[in-house]
């Protein structure tokens, strides 16, 4: 039975879908003004993991992840680039999809874009005005009346009184309360805009997600997810808008993933301490990056370093060495491993414990391959089956272990030298055999002699 940590209740609770075996999940996606950094990759992989485990467990999941394609940052970047905002977002959306494909991230079932839901935003804003939760001061803006919503702060545990005392908010005479947030922004010169009942303008960030999520999944759905940095104010404001508009619970459970940190600080573009996914993939195999992101618990912060990536690479090499050379088989055996893996994953998607189970399977595969290759092959297939939940170990072992060889060594030359060494060994010319091995080693290649013959991989 799956238990999840619900940020709304600040407790771990048994997951009970609203509608039998069907699960509806919405996750806040990217604001597409630049290439995705590794922090975005963290969120992508975290909710890809949730998606994979829910489906592996037999749930019928509808996964929606939005794209924010109109925003101050987008407008400013497009202006700096001398291009239209939609040309910029089209390029960045394509780049995001390329990054996701390389990290083996499954596509969401729906990927709504904010600019396709302007009419829905108008409708929700008008409902909020009609119910007294929003007001239009006459300058083209529309604001949400925070003080009217009795449940404000229930997600973040922040109190309105404390926010007013602690906030440094610029005076805006058009607001009734400094904490009120914008639902609709009146048009400014040179900015994209849409007509509305309150004049030309564009939506605020928070209303975008309220409308896209409820449009795709209904007024109430099972899971809302995102990075922990979105808990306040974004997700708090989503709840305030949505529940005031519909009179219903917005999302039953809230999942928040941890941040990537560099020297203890959150990785972000605003702090200029970020690495794009593309930067990292220039140096490391995509599966190494994915394993780094998925092997830590999704709610934990990950401290990014070259050492952590090297550790991820070494872990995957252990897995692939165990798989290497075994015949293709159907998953067989390992029922106790499956049970323990499932127990770990059902405990709030506990990937550290799940990975520990996979390493125990590696030890058993290595033990079996010396005495029972058939059993070893069946257990290896089981290992790959479970690892598919993490989105790893789906490559051919040699392909991963030789990754990066292009441009570094001549594979044909290595293969020719291996054949020459085998001939020398067959002729019992041990000196020549050793000389060839030394030559291959000097090329940065490691040889491994086994029952199935000699294989090779790049040295670290």
Curated annotation (Swiss-Prot):
Q: Which GO terms describe its biological process?
A: cysteinyl-tRNA aminoacylation
Q: How is the cofactor bound?
A: Binds 1 zinc ion per subunit.
Enzyme Commission no:
6.1.1.16
Swiss-Prot/TrEMBL keywords: Aminoacyl-tRNA synthetase, ATP-binding, Cytoplasm, Ligase, Metal-binding, Nucleotide-binding, Protein biosynthesis, Zinc
The entry marks the following residues as binding ATP, namely 269
A GO cellular component term found in this entry reads:
cytosol
What top-level branch of life does the organism fall under? Bacteria
The residue numbers the entry assigns to motif 'KMSKS' region are 266-270
Query: Predominant location of this chain?
Result: cytoplasm
PANTHER family hit by this protein:
CYSTEINE--TRNA LIGASE, CYTOPLASMIC (PTHR10890:SF3), CYSTEINYL-TRNA SYNTHETASE (PTHR10890)
Per the similarity annotation, which family is this?
Belongs to the class-I aminoacyl-tRNA synthetase family.
* Subunit text: Monomer.
Question: Per its record, how is this protein called by name?
Answer: Cysteine--tRNA ligase
Organism of this sequence: Pseudomonas savastanoi pv. phaseolicola (strain 1448A / Race 6) (Pseudomonas syringae pv. phaseolicola (strain 1448A / Race 6))
């Amino acid at each position: 039975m799956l238990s999840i940590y619900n940020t709304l209740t600040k407790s771990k609770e048994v997951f009970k879908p609203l509608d039998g075996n069907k699960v509806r999940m919405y996750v806040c996606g990217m604001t597409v003004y630049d290439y995705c950094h590794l922090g975005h990759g963290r969120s992508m992989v975290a909710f890809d993991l949730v998606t994979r485990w829910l489906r592996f467990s037999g749930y019928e999941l509808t996964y929606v992840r939005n794209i924010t394609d109109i925003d101050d940052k987008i407008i400013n970047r497009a202006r700096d680039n001398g291009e239209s905002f939609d040309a910029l977002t089209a390029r960045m959306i394509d780049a995001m999809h390329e990054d996701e494909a390389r990290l083996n991230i499954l596509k969401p079932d729906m990927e709504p874009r904010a600019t396709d839901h302007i009419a829905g935003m108008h409708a929700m804003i008008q409902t909020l005005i009609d119910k007294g939760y929003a007001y239009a001061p006459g300058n083209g803006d529309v604001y949400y009346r925070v003080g009217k919503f009795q449940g404000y702060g229930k997600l973040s545990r922040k109190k309105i009184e404390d926010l007013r005392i602690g906030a440094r908010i610029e005076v805006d005479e058009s607001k009734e309360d400094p904490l009120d947030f914008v639902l609709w922004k009146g048009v400014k010169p040179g900015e994209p805009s849409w007509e509305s009942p309150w004049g030309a303008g564009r939506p605020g960030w928070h209303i975008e997600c309220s409308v896209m999520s409820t449009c795709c999944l209904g007024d109430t759905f099972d899971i809302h997810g995102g990075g922990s940095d979105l808990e306040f104010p974004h997700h708090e404001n989503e709840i305030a808008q949505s529940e005031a508009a519909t009179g219903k619970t917005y999302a039953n459970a809230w999942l928040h993933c941890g941040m990537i940190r560099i020297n203890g600080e959150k990785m972000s573009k605003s702090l200029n301490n970020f690495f794009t996914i593309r930067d990292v993939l220039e140096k490391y195999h995509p599966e190494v990056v994915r394993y780094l992101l998925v092997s830590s618990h999704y709610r934990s912060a990950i401290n990014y370093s070259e050492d952590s990536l090297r550790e991820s690479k070494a872990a995957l090499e252990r897995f692939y060495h165990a798989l290497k050379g075994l015949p293709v088989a159907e998953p067989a055996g390992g029922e106790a491993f499956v049970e323990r893996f499932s127990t770990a994953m059902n405990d709030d998607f506990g990937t550290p414990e799940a990975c520990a189970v996979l390493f125990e399977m590696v030890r058993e595969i290595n033990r079996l391959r010396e005495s029972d290759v058939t059993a070893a092959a069946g257990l290896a297939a089981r290992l790959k089956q479970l690892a598919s939940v993490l989105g790893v170990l789906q490559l051919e072992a040699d392909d991963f272990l030789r990754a990066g060889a292009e441009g570094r060594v001549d594979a044909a030359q290595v293969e020719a030298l291996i054949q020459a060494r085998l001939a020398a060994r067959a002729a019992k010319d041990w000196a020549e055999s050793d000389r060839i091995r030394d030559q291959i080693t000097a090329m940065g290649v490691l040889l491994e002699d086994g029952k199935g013959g000699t294989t090779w991989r790049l040295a670290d």
